[in-house]
Amino acid sequence: VTIRPADAADLPAFFAYLDDHLRDNGRDGAPLFQPPPVPTMRTHSPLPPGLRIAFIKGLDIPVGEPGWRRLWLALDARGSIAGHVDVRARPEPSARHRAMLGMGVHRAYRRRGLGMQLVDTAIAWARGEESLKWIDLEVLSENHPAVALYLRAGFTMTARIEDMLEIDGVSHDLSYMRYALR
């Protein structure tokens, strides 16, 4: 598997991969890793149009400006996407020294260390960005494999909000984690 930065030409394949990845959300023994866009509807595309636009526009925005985003893809020997990690601007205007991390690994490549490689790639890049001091993330507290991965990568737990989300009538806690770059 090779990890490389993505560009605009990669986005159609990335969106197809991400749509498929999000369909695994809480299914067939996979942990629930994010709330579905409509909590009771899992049959339509789980990839909201606004997210597509955020990726398309964000890749061209300079780091430090509102809406910036960087994306890396893990490609297998056939060139298929095996996983991804993105680092993006926080929405708060006074938090330009912080970034948010999101990631995912295709079902066929989980539990092989690829998640750690992706997180390490994002951290290494962020360390090279002088304006960034922190990487933040949000994770459903019950997603124990993801929480364990982030802790092994050096993230620390900053908060856990009980009953933050209600999905299909079930309460879920949300954990907030951070990584100090400096």
Residue positions per predicted region:
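Conserved acetyl-CoA-binding loop-helix of GNAT-fold acetyltransferases
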Residues: 105, 111-125, 147-152
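Conserved GNAT acetyl-CoA-binding A-motif
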Residues: 119, 126-138
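A short beta-loop-alpha structural element at the N-terminal edge
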Residues: 2-16, 22-29
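Hydrophobic adenine-recognition pocket in adenosine-nucleotide-binding enzymes
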Residues: 6, 103-105, 139
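Acetyl-CoA-dependent GNAT
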Residues: 19-28, 32-97, 102-108, 180-182
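Terminal substrate-recognition subdomain of acyl/acetyltransferases
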Residues: 170-182
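Conserved catalytic-core motifs of GNAT/GCN5-like acyltransferases
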Residues: 134-139, 151, 156-172
